[in-house]
Amino acid sequence: MEPLRKRVKVYQLDNSGKWDDKGTGHVSCIYVDALCAMGLIVRSESDNSVILQTRLSAEDIYQKQQDSLIVWTEPDSQLDLALSFQDSLGCQDIWENILQYQNQRTGSCDSVDLDLPPVSINNLQTINELLEASLPMLDKDKIINSIFKEDLVRSLLDLFDEIEKSGEGGVHLFQIFNIFKNLILFNDTSILEVILSEDYLVRVMGALEYDPEISENNRIKHREFLNQQVVFKQVIKFPSKSLIGTIHQTFRIQYLKDVVLPRVLDDVTFSSLNSLIYFNNIDIVSQIQNDSDFLENLFSEIQKSEKNSEERKDLILFLQDLCNLAKGLQIQSKSTFFTVVVSLGLFKTLSAILDDENVQTRVSCTEIVLSTLLHDPEILRSYLCSPTSGNSKFLVQLINLFITDKDIGVKNQIVEIIKTLLEADSYDSSDFFRLFYDKGIDLLVSPLNEVYKGEPTIPGDPSSNLDSFVLYNIMELVIYCIKHHCYRIKHFIVEEGIAKKILRYTNPTGSGGGGGGGGNSERYLILGSIRFFRSMVNMKDDLYNQHIIQENLFEPIIEVFKSNISRYNLLNSAIIELFQYIYKENIRDLIVYLVERYRELFESVTYTDVLKQLILKYEQIKDSSFESPETSCNNNDSSSNDIDSKPIIGNNKINHNYQRTQREIDEEEEEAYFNRDDDSEDSDDEDELIPISINNNNNNNNNNKQICTNNENNMEKNDDNIEKDNENTNNGNGSSHIKIVDYEDEDDEDDEINKSVESDDIVEKHEIIDKNEKKDEIMKENNDSDNDDNDNNDNDNDNDNNSDIENKNHLNNNGNNENNENNDDVQDKSNNKNNSDKINEDEKIEKQDEMKENLEMEEIDEKVKEKQPKDIKKENQSQPDETVFNGKSNNSNNNNNNNNNNSNNQEIGDNRKTTPKRKLDYEKNESVVSKKIDKSNGPTSIDKDINGCDESPNKKLNNNNSNNNNNNNNNNNNNNNNNNNNNNNNNNNNNNNQNDENELSSASEEEEEQLENGKHIKKFKRGKKDSNNSSNNSNNSSPTPSELHV
């Protein structure tokens, strides 16, 4: 190719981004001898000097800009260059030459370039430059072919020998070093195989000794090392020579990579050498594991060898190297190898030589065991637990060697072995754990029972003390067991007292107790003991906590804390962290134990808040440990049977659980309780039992409660008595509560009304008393007592007072019941059930009589209504509201007592009477008044009273009884009866109007009422024992006909 001479300017881009003018000259595209390739060369037009000389690249790095500019970046130096042509024709000619070279890559230049020159001293530089150049992959392949064609390696080694013998070719030896280095960096497997072959390896190592960057005094003599120091020793006959060759080659590659060329190897070449080593190892292991005879022979030779012999040491080292090679294989290949060697007797062979006197032999044995465990621990566990006799002895041998061996390397290896064996949580390892806790752990912790006074093997290094090393690792192993083997280790520690033995080593002075001392404990032994104790506390196990408390195991920890209380060191911080953990986890037993035992010490520590928080937590625990009222009420052992226990009043509420518990007392205890309280009825201490919401009967509430309860007991025992009512309202004490008597029929909704009592708002407006069945009892009592009315007037007067008191007591008790709706509901259901049972017993007998009586009542009521004057009806409708509670009325004095009795009877009425005002409200809601039919007691009628509202059944009963008495007496009594009836109705209106205006009553009237109530109560209780059991009769709980109608 003829040179094209064109006039150009050469530019180079500097670091600042500016183009520097390098000169003007003529450019040619020719073969450059110095480059041994086609290139661009620019010579100065002034002195013909070379301004630019660059090799043409086959890569697409050139760009033509406009018509006279070619720009590119050098691949090696990363310099940005540009040629600016004088005319566009010259630029086009050079551009075409570049494209032709890239497209064809042919011509005299290529064929000459890729032919290596003959090997000689004069051509060493040319060969070196050719190998150093960055060539395309095609050119590299051609050079590699030329290397093998010309036998370049052998020729260079021959030249190296001649130059080295002459002793005058220092520069040429450096050039040969660079040539071999570049051959290796070619990263071609075929070239590496030639260089590392047995024929050329030692001579190549000699050429690589002359590194120009290393001085002659520091030069490494590789040949001397390989020939004299590295000697291949065959301890056992190998099955084939190819295996031996692979072993040699692997060693040499490893030496070349790690010793000869570690500085000059790039990443690609380094990786290629590792790959070559890896595949050689696979080949070696595969050949050995496939030859079972070879392995059996190997194990047999090891067992036959004498103790502490060189032969045994070499054999075990060979086995160790073989296992190390297998560790680097893939999982499948590694698993296959270890399975084969274990099945052929690996562990049995190691057990036979584990106690060898040679340290290297013991280290190699433990290293082989550890290599097996790192692959799969189940291999050794299965071997130890196999039914073959004697296999479990291998575990005992390892533990004994850990305790007694004098080499710290052996101890370290065995500790790792035991840890690896214990790292199991699967069900398959249960057999091994059983073996370990039966035969291994007692031996493992046996050094804790002895006194150790060992000295460090290295002066000034406490960690070199072998005895302390053993103790520390025992602590670490026990800590691991505590964390992962909760069940077995827990009982072992408690039964064998391991904690107490370990905590002896917290004593830095060396004084120990209990048959052994801790010696002069090293600092790390004390920390190990604290860490062991911390692991026990960390489990938060009751057995551990009780063991700590019973054995007083905190004492050694506290002693360490006292000795370091003013020091800011690791021991102090570790113990404070222990206290902080106990506080945060709220381990109550330990908190109480610590504070009660060491409170003075904790209070003296002011530089941390942990101990103060611990004391505060203790106070909270102690406060909560006392039985609260609610808890004590639910406790059936003590508080429920304590007659002096009282409900706690807080926020105007009584403890409901307490009251419910008192009601659950059996009948005999309840009678004894109230009989005792009867004797101390005036006790002022029981005033606190009164709910704050009942403010008008504070002085007599406890007595009323007792009377009410006794009446309840009497009513339960007497079939003729009526059971107590569960839901009442305050009787004239400023309460707007209204009683409604509602008899059960098909349209009644008493169940829903009773459920609504649970709400306080509904209770205040709709307090419902569902005692329909009691009507039969009242009617029966009325019929039985009609004929004896005149004979029982005196008793009736007393009964009036007693009934009045009973009513007020019921009301006071109901004030308490309002604060205990849930408990009252429970008793309501039980009382209703008892009432219904009693009524069902008499239902068949009384049904017909009651139906007749009801019919007669209807006829009599109709006659009374016909005789009723209309002017009286108007007068009653316009009657102003007056207070009848204190016996005041506009009627005559003769009717005054009757009004009081009638008012009391209406208030009592066995808590069944409905006031007219509340009845009117009830009718407004119902809008239609319908006749109610009692399914069990027969039909009843509802008539209009003189005020135009429905008259309650009790009131009709009063009319009926009155008319019956008048029929027995003279006709004049009929008129008096009617007048009394009218007066009673007037008083009823007044009484109900008084209930409406009761909130406006004066304080003096309330005090007067309280005094009057007190007199009635005392009168009742004084006459209670003197009367002929009148309190047990029906008069105490149900009004007689004379009470209902005077």
From Swiss-Prot:
Residues 695-713, 804-820, 889-905, 958-995, 1028-1038 have a biased composition (Low complexity). It is found in: Cytoplasm, Cell cortex; Nucleus. Residues 1-101 form the WH1 domain. The keyword Transferase does not apply. The keyword Nucleus applies. It comes from the Eukaryota. A motif (Nuclear localization signal) lies at residues 1003-1022. Keywords: Cytoplasm, Nucleus. InterPro entries: ARM-type_fold, EVH1_PP4R3, P4R3-like_central_dom, PH-like_dom_sf, PP4R3-like. Residues 714-727, 753-783, 826-855, 862-876, 909-935 have a biased composition (Basic and acidic residues). One of its GO terms (cellular component) is protein phosphatase 4 complex. Residues 626-1046 are annotated as: Disordered. Disulfide bonds: none annotated. Belongs to the SMEK family. Interacts with ppp4c. PANTHER family: ATP SYNTHASE GAMMA-RELATED, SERINE_THREONINE-PROTEIN PHOSPHATASE 4 REGULATORY SUBUNIT 3. The EVH1/WH1 domain is necessary for cortical localization. Suppresses MEK1 null cell polarity, chemotaxis, and gene expression defects. Required for proper cytokinesis during vegetative growth, timely exit from the mound stage during development, and myosin II assembly. May be a regulatory subunit of serine/threonine-protein phosphatase 4 (PP4) and may control localization of PP4 to the nucleus. Involved in the regulation of some ppp4c functions, such as developmental progression, chemotaxis, expression of stress response genes and cell movement. This is Suppressor of Mek1. It comes from Dictyostelium discoideum. The lineage of its organism: Eukaryota, Amoebozoa, Evosea, Eumycetozoa, Dictyostelia. The gene is smkA.
